[in-house]
């Protein structure tokens, strides 16, 4: 079985930075650390409201990443222009609502086929690989195939947020069946949204999966796992100042 790739989403490094309007923590530095730790790619979502990642972040990351850049974006003229200028390795087209905390569902490709087809064609002409963030639904997979996109990313939110084991198993089976169906149609299959250290194993075990994009859980774990060293370093500096 081929190696499963990990795309690390660093949006919430920028969320923490922007909460205080400081230049730190720096998403570019975080991307470097993630790459050194084994990340196969870095994912960022340039939202229309710029609530975390900024245009400047995107441009610097494109110049400095040693792996691959996956730019998540809404299907708007502004974002298409930015993508065609910056030329990330991948663009993942996602739905976007300004009032949402995070992306709440998959892109309705079938319901806006012409718009998605045109976006995929435009990005492809700029030599950017395109992925469509969709729910585990055969109708959406068929629409993704028709669009000309090479990749889909299956939205795993319903699986991750399932209130009980029975519901989670049902959602897992939907993802499994969708992955099998999509792979048979010639699509490369990624997945992401809500994946954590506690629920990732069944998804990672699916042979059709090419890459998982995970962010919030990794950044949350990093805050806790790195807290001991961070506190100790600050205390050491304070002691040094009094010597």
Swiss-Prot record:
Catalyzes the complicated ring closure reaction between the two acyclic compounds 1-deoxy-D-xylulose-5-phosphate (DXP) and 3-amino-2-oxopropyl phosphate (1-amino-acetone-3-phosphate or AAP) to form pyridoxine 5'-phosphate (PNP) and inorganic phosphate. This is Pyridoxine 5'-phosphate synthase. 1-deoxy-D-xylulose 5-phosphate binds at residues 11-12, 47, 52, 102. One of its GO terms (molecular function) is pyridoxine 5'-phosphate synthase activity. It comes from the Bacteria. The record marks 153 as: Transition state stabilizer. The lineage of its organism: Bacteria, Pseudomonadati, Pseudomonadota, Gammaproteobacteria, Enterobacterales. Its EC number is 2.6.99.2. One of its GO terms (biological process) is pyridoxine biosynthetic process. 3-amino-2-oxopropyl phosphate binds at residues 9, 20, 194, 215-216. The keyword Cytoplasm applies. It holds the Pfam family PdxJ. It catalyses: 3-amino-2-oxopropyl phosphate + 1-deoxy-D-xylulose 5-phosphate = pyridoxine 5'-phosphate + phosphate + 2 H2O + H(+).
């Amino acid at each position: 079985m081929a190696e499963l790739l990990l795309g690390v989403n660093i949006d919430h490094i920028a969320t923490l930075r922007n909460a205080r309007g400081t230049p730190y923590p720096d998403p570019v530095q975080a991307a470097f650390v993630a790459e050194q730790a084994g990340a196969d790619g870095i994912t960022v979502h340039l939202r229309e409201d710029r609530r975390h990642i900024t245009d400047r972040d995107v441009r610097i990351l494109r110049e400095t990443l040693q792996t691959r850049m996956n730019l998540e974006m809404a299907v708007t003229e502004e974002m298409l222009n930015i993508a065609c200028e910056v030329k990330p390795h991948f663009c993942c087209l996602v739905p976007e609502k300004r009032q949402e905390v995070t992306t709440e569902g998959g892109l309705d490709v079938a319901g806006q086929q012409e718009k998605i087809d045109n976006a995929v064609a435009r990005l492809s002409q700029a030599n950017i690989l395109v992925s469509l963030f969709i729910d585990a639904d055969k109708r959406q997979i068929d629409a993704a195939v028709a669009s000309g996109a090479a990749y889909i990313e299956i939205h795993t939110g319903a699986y991750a947020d399932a209130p009980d084991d029975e519901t989670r198993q049902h959602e897992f089976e939907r993802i499994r069946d969708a992955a099998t169906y999509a792979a048979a149609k010639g699509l490369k299959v990624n997945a992401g949204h809500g994946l954590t250290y506690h629920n990732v194993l069944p998804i990672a075990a699916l042979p059709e999966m090419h890459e998982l994009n995970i962010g919030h859980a990794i950044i949350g774990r990093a805050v806790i796992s790195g807290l001991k060293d961070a506190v100790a370093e600050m205390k050491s500096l304070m002691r040094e100042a009094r010597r």
